[in-house]
């Protein structure tokens, strides 16, 4: 079952709290990351990728949960969203809609940065695809890297690249 807006807000509040905000992903980054993990060329167990949710720089710092109940709730939301991404791509990939289309609080740049992080996390497995089909990755690079953002701002074509994300994801998943 997809997360509700309230559940996305709850997850975002946790990730943005003072104890986590400097190093953890926000919800948009998280979804991009989970999407790359979900559609990537090989399965990655949650135990390998979850530390990166809390510590984008090195995957070494643990989340700061106030209680066991909070830990259980947040983990449940993340894994449910991850499973929903997997389900969507396995049943109807064209219906996937990145969270950044739901509101301005969810950024396409952050989403793309998360996707790139997921890509880099599993770089060896992705390398053949990215070398063989580099244009499939252009939307993420134009929106999710400092150099790409500079080029995109200068060209004024962010919406073009945002619109290119879903078709690129469908092609990557089909590969």
Predicted regions and their residues:
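Domain-length accessory/inserted modules outside core catalytic folds
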Residues: 1-112, 116-175
């Amino acid at each position: 079952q997809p997360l509700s807006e309230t559940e996305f807000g709850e997850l975002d509040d946790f990730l943005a709290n003072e104890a986590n905000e400097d190093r953890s992903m926000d919800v948009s980054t998280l979804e991009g990351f989970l999407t790359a993990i979900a559609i990537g060329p090989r399965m990655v167990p949650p135990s390998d990728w979850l530390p990166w949710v809390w510590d984008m720089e090195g995957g070494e710092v643990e989340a700061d949960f106030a209680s066991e109940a909070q830990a259980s709730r947040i983990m449940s939301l993340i894994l449910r969203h991850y499973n929903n991404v997997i389900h969507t791509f396995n049943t109807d990939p064209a219906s996937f809609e990145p969270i950044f289309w739901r509101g301005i609080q969810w950024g396409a740049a952050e989403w793309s940065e998360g996707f790139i992080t997921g890509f880099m996390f599993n770089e060896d497995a992705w390398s053949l695809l990215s070398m063989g089909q580099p244009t499939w990755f252009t939307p993420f690079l134009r929106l999710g890297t400092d150099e790409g953002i500079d080029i995109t701002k200068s060209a004024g074509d962010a919406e073009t690249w945002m619109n290119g994300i879903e078709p690129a994801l469908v092609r990557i998943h089909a590969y």
